[in-house]
């Protein structure tokens, strides 16, 4: 699902809202999540999951084409950890037991 499909689905479930208003709301939510992560904050949506930033240290990499060793700078990457309710629902809907993983 892409963002435009998400907006369309939300608008269909909420006929009292215009699609452009739903799009503005979705964009505002996503922008606030990005802004919080850029500040170094963690964003937790209870039952859904938590967004955070992980820092990867500098390391020595290798160019796969030439085999040459190249330095890779440290970087920050977004990280998402699913919430308990989401994990349980995904496992239940897929016929997998949450306790055993099978």
From Swiss-Prot:
Biological-process GO terms, alphabetical: DNA recombination; regulation of DNA-templated transcription; regulation of translation
Coiled coil: none
Pfam families the UniProt entry points to: Bac_DNA_binding
Gene Ontology annotations for the cellular component aspect, listed alphabetically: chromosome; cytosol
Function: This protein is one of the two subunits of integration host factor, a specific DNA-binding protein that functions in genetic recombination as well as in transcriptional and translational control.
The protein's assembly and partners: Heterodimer of an alpha and a beta chain.
Name of the featured protein: Integration host factor subunit beta
Organism of provenance: Rhodopseudomonas palustris (strain BisA53)
